[in-house]
Amino acid sequence: MTIEIHDLSKQFGSFTALNDINLKVNPGELLALLGPSGSGKTTLLRVIAGLETADSGQVLFNEEDSTDKHIRDRHVGFVFQHYALFRNMTIFENVAFGLRVRPRKQRPNAPEINHRVTELLQLVQLDWLADRYPHQLSGGQRQRIALARALAVEPSVLLLDEPFGALDAKVRKELRAWLRKLHDDMHITSVFVTHDQEEALEVADRIVVMNRGRIEQIGTPDEVYEKPANPFVYEFLGHVNLFHGRVHQGHAWIGDLEVDAPEYSEAEDLSAIAYVRPHDIEVDRTLNGEPALAAHIVHILAIGPVVRLELAGKDNQSTNSIYAEISKERFRELQLARGDQVFIKPRKLDLFPNHAQNGSIH
């Protein structure tokens, strides 16, 4: 199933929830709608489902205009954050519910329903819980049952609204891997909403980054992480260091550090913002004859095989603390301690003169 969104807009009073959205979801794709609260991601999902009506624009399923179709005619499965399981029904009956309430002509017979439900419970690896009730299950188990119930009616499209948002971190991580594998096995066109950057990067085939009712960027996890389209995407996708500087005729200056910026060869003394991820910062005790920024260590935090350094710059090139991530081996080699002076330089940075177009400097 292909989903196409054309020129979609939606207002709630004076608030613009969606502003001229254009998007195509490919058959069998697992697409993430990622953004902060109020970005429009859930509204877009609900419009696709038929739970909300757009003020303008079109929703097409397999090139057929479905904008005005009722939700029951769109053949979508919907999974909510809070499960929405029927408390008075067993797990088996919860999964069977959508099949039992179908119109008589479309309703499978009892043996077919039993076979389908058993098959789905085996798929989500919870067939041994068929006779239990929702309150007897963990949060992760309940969410898997909610997904099985959505799949029972054999939807053409699966829509998930922050499906793991109510679960703890360990369970979320386990279910992310499980959902990715399940999708690879089933190849059903799926769209899920999340505000969790790691979740989107780990699970999705492509990510749609949204902000204030607009799409900021569409791309694979690698594309949006390695080549952010603008400062918003850069700051939203994981930890990042922000430096203030200037760019002039193909060169950029951040404090005393000069780097080549050939894509801005025609720039004339523009203010600029440079972004560097913590793992792209080299740390050394000496200058080694190369330009670098001086800083001192404020805090040291070891996280597994990685050591995270909080640094304070000697100049005003960064308005906040600077963070660098190095391996434990490198940390031991440098014999670093709190208060030590170090010299830092970026392996890679992305420069945005006047918050304009993206350029990568290596």
Curated annotation (Swiss-Prot):
Subcellular location: Cell inner membrane
GO cellular component terms given for this protein: ATP-binding cassette (ABC) transporter complex
Pfam family, one: ABC_tran
Subunit relationships: The complex is composed of two ATP-binding proteins (CysA), two transmembrane proteins (CysT and CysW) and a solute-binding protein (CysP).
Organism: Nitrosomonas europaea (strain ATCC 19718 / CIP 103999 / KCTC 2705 / NBRC 14298)
Keyword list, A-Z: ATP-binding, Cell inner membrane, Cell membrane, Membrane, Nucleotide-binding, Sulfate transport, Translocase, Transport
UniProt protein name: Sulfate/thiosulfate import ATP-binding protein CysA
Predominant location: membrane
Family indicated by similarity: Belongs to the ABC transporter superfamily. Sulfate/tungstate importer (TC 3.A.1.6) family.
EC number, as in UniProt: 7.3.2.3
Chain residues that bind ATP: G35, P36, S37, G38, S39, G40, K41, T42
InterPro entries given in the database record: AAA+_ATPase, ABC_SmlMolc_Importer, ABC_transporter-like_ATP-bd, ABC_transporter-like_CS, CysA_C, Mo/tungstate-bd_C_term_dom, P-loop_NTPase, Sulph_transpt1
Domain ABC transporter: residue ranges: 3-237
CDD domains: ABC_CysA_sulfate_importer
Catalysis: reaction(s): sulfate(out) + ATP + H2O = sulfate(in) + ADP + phosphate + H(+); thiosulfate(out) + ATP + H2O = thiosulfate(in) + ADP + phosphate + H(+)
Biological function: Part of the ABC transporter complex CysAWTP involved in sulfate/thiosulfate import. Responsible for energy coupling to the transport system.
